[in-house]
């Protein structure tokens, strides 16, 4: 079998035209490789059995499994299967960094802060030590409890940094109206200006002041909530909207698993109505959910049927993550939500019914540990090796001759569906939002910048390699300006986080390359790569409304779930780290940087590969083929 090497990816990389022979290794069912630490030959690895919040004593892990119990890893050294040590003792290079990010402590045991912290939204499941610390943070909870969040609900529009000038002008008008009303109150010898609300000469001015004052009070209240988290200083809780306000809102959104828009949008305003302890409890449930998914090997989350269910009455994901626009109707033979009921069952067995109960449990289990609980059975079609396939619907496609001057909001967004053969029935397991290509900047050979259409290839492909902790080898066509970030102190820095590996990598946490199969005259096959793949993404909001450079982006936490599911339910071989020598000098504003990457990631080869079919979608533009002309680069 021949395989055309991938260099980079849908970030504009050109695939290698050469092919190399695939390594011939014997494949083994992934179930044999999964958690080797749970059992040890000739010994009893004990786990704690818990039922309805009560400790039932210790039991050998093998006995617990034989009794139909599920073993949950609640240690702070847990990682998804993708990043865990293999049965042969191989450790993915990203393993240690994953644990550092999950525990929010770096290699020197210093706190990870700023933009490097709060990576749950980008695919890193927080350690239970983080949950324990947040629930026990009494000063923070007391600060929030002293604030009545109700005034925030008076906002009837979304505010952002773009609203800075409007907010400032509105506040000036508020002060002017308040001064005028106060003077009239004094002139009439009123105790308060309320009677002016019904005075024909003053009611309009009073109504305008009242609305502006409600907006000001709402902003001040929201900023006080953010101050409790340490993200705003006292002087920034003045009702203005600055870049510091936007940054603080983004941190709040990242901490509470909301889309990181930096906007005071409806979801964020609603979350601010929720107590800090309740928000921390929801974090605990999200952490537990990923441990349950890992332990049971399930992936079915209801997105292919009637949608995800609440866990203990709580929806754990924002609505935008539950379905692509235009893809909410149940699919034929769509699998029901198993993830939420399984998580709720685990929470009930552990006694995690509220913030105080979780806090007490974690206080009694400071080291975490592995526990055995009784959970509902997994579907009968689950097996160590399953017949799986995937389909990507490109949704509504517009082949515009030139980049449109606005962001097009299509009715039918792209989606990815994973199927399983359920004893002859093609069962849709999940249906997740994704992206397709569009217009993007590209550097030409002469150094000039243009925009070029980045097409998402249509037709049958396969996923052969699952690459955990992938790096992005930025091709020469990627402009230098896209590889640097402004430090806002007169200097720039290389975007090492975008090169990876890590949650902010251009490929996210997992990459599944799309390979095209060609038959050879000798009966063999050649696998060609065109630089397109399915992968995680730190560009969370682009999955809701944006486009890519041709690849199919997934929310990082879902990409990790998909990669884990493939390893649990598909024969594979461990290829290990993929060495590479990537070097590039990046120059911007008289500063130079050297990019250095020595691995493409830790690879697992699926045997056989999983079939993927990319549908043409609904081409709604007059033009029916991708545009070939270039367009001026974005300013």
Write out the residue ranges for each language-model feature.
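N-terminal pre-domains immediately preceding structured catalytic cores
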Residues: 10-635
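Bacterial N-terminal signal peptides
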Residues: 1-9
């Amino acid at each position: 079998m021949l395989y055309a090497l991938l260099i980079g990816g849908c970030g504009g990389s050109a695939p290698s035209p050469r092919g190399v022979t695939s390594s011939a290794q014997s494949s083994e069912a992934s179930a044999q490789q999964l958690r080797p630490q749970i059992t040890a030959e000739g010994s009893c690895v004990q786990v704690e059995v818990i039922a309805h919040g009560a400790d039932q004593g210790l039991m050998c892990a093998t006995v617990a499994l034989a009794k139909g119990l599920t073993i949950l890893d609640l240690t702070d050294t847990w990682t998804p299967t993708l990043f865990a040590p293999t049965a042969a003792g191989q450790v993915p290079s990203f393993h240690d960094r994953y644990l550092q990010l999950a525990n929010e402590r770096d290699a020197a045991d210093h706190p990870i802060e700023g933009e490097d912290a709060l990576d749950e939204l980008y695919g890193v499941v927080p350690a239970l030590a983080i949950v324990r610390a947040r629930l026990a943070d009494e000063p923070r909870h007391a600060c929030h409890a002293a604030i009545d969040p109700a005034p925030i609900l008076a906002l009837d529009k979304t505010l952002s940094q773009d609203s800075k000038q409007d907010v400032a002008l509105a506040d000036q008008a508020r002060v002017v109206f308040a001064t005028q009303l106060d003077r009239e109150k004094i002139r009439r010898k009123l105790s308060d200006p309320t009677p002016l609300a019904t005075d024909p000469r003053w009611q309009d001015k009073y109504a305008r002041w009242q609305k502006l004052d409600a907006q000001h009070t709402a902003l001040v209240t929201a900023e006080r909530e953010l101050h409790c988290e340490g993200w705003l200083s006292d002087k920034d809780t003045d009702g203005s909207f600055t870049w510091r306000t936007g940054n603080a809102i983004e941190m709040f959104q990242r901490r509470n698993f909301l889309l990181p828009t930096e906007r005071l949008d409806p979801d964020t305003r609603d979350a601010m109505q929720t107590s800090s302890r309740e928000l921390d409890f929801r974090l605990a449930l999200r952490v537990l959910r990923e441990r349950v998914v890992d332990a049971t090997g399930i992936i079915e989350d209801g997105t292919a049927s009637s949608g995800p269910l609440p866990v203990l009455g709580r929806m754990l994901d924002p609505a935008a993550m539950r379905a692509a626009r235009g893809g909410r109707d149940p699919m034929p033979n769509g699998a029901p939500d198993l993830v939420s009921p399984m998580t709720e069952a685990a929470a009930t067995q552990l006694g995690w019914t509220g913030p105080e109960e979780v806090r007490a449990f974690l206080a009694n289990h400071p080291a975490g540990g592995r526990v055995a609980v009784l959970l509902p059975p997994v579907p009968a079609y689950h097996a160590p090796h399953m017949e799986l396939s995937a389909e990507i619907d490109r949704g509504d496609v517009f082949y515009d001759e030139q980049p449109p001057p606005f962001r097009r909001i299509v009715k039918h967004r792209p989606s990815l569906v994973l199927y399983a053969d359920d004893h002859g029935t093609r069962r849709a397991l999940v249906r997740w939002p994704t992206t397709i290509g569009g217009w993007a900047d590209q550097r030409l050979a002469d150094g000039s910048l243009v925009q070029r259409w980045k097409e998402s290839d249509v037709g049958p492909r396969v996923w052969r390699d699952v690459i955990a902790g992938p790096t992005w080898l930025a091709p020469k066509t990627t402009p230098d300006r896209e590889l640097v970030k402004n430090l806002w102190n007169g200097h720039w820095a290389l975007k090492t986080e975008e090169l990876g590996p890590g949650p902010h990598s251009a490929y996210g946490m997992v990459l599944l390359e799309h390979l095209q199969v060609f038959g050879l005259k000798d009966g063999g096959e050649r696998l060609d790569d065109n630089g397109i793949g399915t992968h995680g993404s730190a560009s969370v909001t682009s999955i809701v409304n944006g486009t890519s450079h041709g690849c199919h982006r997934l929310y990082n936490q879902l990409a990790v779930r998909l990669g884990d599911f493939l390893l649990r339910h598909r024969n594979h071989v461990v290829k290990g780290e993929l060495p590479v020598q990537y070097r590039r000098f990046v120059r911007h504003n008289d500063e130079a940087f050297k990019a250095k990457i020595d691995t493409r990631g830790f690879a697992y080869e699926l045997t056989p590969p999983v079939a993927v079919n990319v549908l043409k979608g609904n081409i709604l533009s007059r033009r029916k083929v991708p545009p070939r002309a270039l367009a001026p680069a974005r300013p």
